Curated annotation (Swiss-Prot):
Source species of the chain: Salmonella typhimurium (strain LT2 / SGSC1412 / ATCC 700720)
SUPFAM superfamilies: Actin-like ATPase domain
E.C. number(s) listed in UniProt: 2.7.1.5
One Gene Ontology CC term in the entry: cytosol
Binding positions for substrate per the UniProt entry: 83, 236-238, 296
Originating gene: rhaB
Enzyme class: transferase
Name of the protein this chain belongs to: Rhamnulokinase
Keyword Methyltransferase: no
Disulfide bridge map: 68-222, 353-370, 413-417
């Protein structure tokens, strides 16, 4: 067959998309077309920050039906989402309550309990995953301790992409790359860790053994009656984004830039040394047995909140105003846990600057400048940290995802990190999702083969570092700003 049509459902924490890919196996051309885009946002339910799971499912089905109504024969479907959040089901397979967001404050104070009762080094030895207060391990502990009546109804727990695949196929699956984000998968066995799971109070019977990307979960029957296979792709959106990152060699790092920024490198072995633990490095699962050695950074969430609060709709105009301002007048630590979900992001940023005896950003452009400069400096700090961890410097950084469209931030990143930055592709998560589908359909050999297809079909923008820039001169001075209470504290 010359042409393949694959559908990627790509859900982020702020929006979702149904995308159609067309692959010409003869000429190895790959094109994407957006079929349906929709909003994803938090809602308050009984005092919890929850996801409107029914609305998301409705939009997914609407997007799939739009493709089918065009008369296109779909070869496969894949779903990727953000990590750590889950949906509870009863023994009839019906949903129990609404899924609570990782940004909800129910996990406050839970992680310190685990550090005392199990031990930080023991948790890290077992999971190899970074300590974030909203990891699934702490969410489940909060659930079982705070809502025992709800817990009693539960027979299964599915992570977000697995839930939507279940709703399409009727078959349950626990995909490996996303499962590793829970901090509950044993890094040596790739199965759920009995000790960590027992501590949460959740039953092991809620979960099936994690499966690696590439298996067919089941079929979705389209309105025309065709059975379309639903593939378990690398269902954590960052895992998919990394698959589509055209990494040149082992000296290339990646930065998946969106609501979250995830910065790291690929490795055939995990890094679980005391040094890695001290740096709060995570070893999330990737495709083909590779590890995504990385660190979570709060990312463009700060900007997204400011845009929403200030009702700013013209982002290019704001960036142009921001670029005209002097660099590094206002600096914060974007990974300070005060920025996870404040009532007022603008006020929180201003308070952080005030508390560190800095000028206080007032205008929208000043707030954006503060965010961009601070992110670029944090990227540089973490890249240096990771280079020391592996004992080799990086020579190139690939920025993928929606954030790679921000040319100002890309240049600031190149200047601060002191290495060449390659920006693109924008739709990295969607492309990585499609890549696993094409491998499952035997159209591509492996991830490296797929990256060659990406490189041939998608243009990248190069940013050369300027060592004389203002931000480059501030790199060494930024470290004290990170001595605030970070996400892992």
């Amino acid at each position: 067959m010359t042409f393949r049509h694959c559908v990627a459902v790509d859900l982020g924490a702020s929006s979702g998309r149904v995308m159609l890919a067309r692959y010409d196996s003869k000429h190895r051309t790959l094109t994407l077309r957006e079929i349906h885009r929709f909003v994803n946002c938090l809602q308050k339910t009984d005092g919890f920050d929850t996801w409107d799971i029914d609305s998301l499912e409705k939009d997914i089905r609407l997007g799939l039906k739009k493709v089918c109504n065009e008369g296109i024969l779909i070869d496969s479907i894949g779903i990727d989402t953000w990590g750590v959040d889950y949906v509870l089901l009863d023994k009839q397979g019906q949903r129990v309550g609404l899924p609570v967001s990782y940004r909800d404050n129910r996990t406050t104070g839970i992680m310190p309990q685990a550090l005392v009762q199990i031990g930080k080094s023991e948790i890290y030895r077992r999971s190899g995953i970074q300590f974030l207060p909203f990891n699934t391990i702490y969410q489940l502990r909060a659930l079982t301790k705070q809502q025992p009546e709800l817990t009693a109804q539960v027979a299964h727990a599915l992570l977000m992409p697995d839930y939507f695949s279940y709703r399409l196929t009727g078959e349950m699956n626990w995909e490996y790359t996303n499962a590793t984000t829970t901090q509950l998968v044993n890094i040596n066995t790739d199965d759920w860790d009995d000790t960590l799971l027992a501590w949460t109070g959740a039953k092991k019977s809620w979960f099936g053994r994690p499966s690696h990307p590439g298996n067919v979960i089941g079929d979705w029957i389209c309105p025309q009656g065709n059975r379309i296979p639903v593939v378990a792709v690398a269902s954590h959106d960052t895992a998919s984004a990394v698959i589509a990152s055209p990494l040149a060699n082992k000296h290339s790092a990646y930065l998946s830039s969106g609501t979250w920024s995830l910065m790291g490198f690929e490795s055939k072995m995990p890094y679980t040394t005391d040094e890695a633990l001290a740096a709060n490095i995570t070893n999330e699962g990737g495709a083909e047995g590779r590890y995504r050695v990385l660190k979570n950074i709060m990312g463009l969430w700060l900007l997204q909140r400011v845009l929403k609060e200030r009702r700013i709709t013209d982002l290019p105009a704001l960036i142009a105003q921001t670029e005209a301002l002097p660099a590094c007048r206002f600096l914060i630590n974007p990974n300070d846990d005060r920025f996870i979900n404040p009532d007022d992001m603008r006020a929180e940023i201003q308070a952080a600057c005030r508390e560190t005896d800095q000028p206080v950003p007032v205008s929208d452009a000043e707030l954006a400048r503060c965010i961009f400069d601070s992110l670029a400096l944090l990227y540089a700090d973490i890249l240096h940290e990771q280079a020391n961890l592996r004992g080799e410097k990086f020579t190139q950084l690939h920025i993928v995802g929606g954030g790679c469209q921000n040319s100002l931030l890309n240049q600031l990143c190149a200047d601060a990190c002191g290495i060449r930055v390659m920006a693109g592709p924008v739709e990295a998560s969607t492309l990585g999702n499609i890549g696993i589908q094409l491998m499952t359909l035997d159209e591509l050999n492996n991830v490296d083969d797929f990256r060659q297809v990406v490189s041939a079909n998608y243009d990248l923008t190069t940013y050369i570092p300027n060592p004389d820039s203002e931000i480059a001169r501030h790199v060494a001075q930024f470290q004290p700003k990170r001595q605030t209470k970070e996400l892992c504290a």
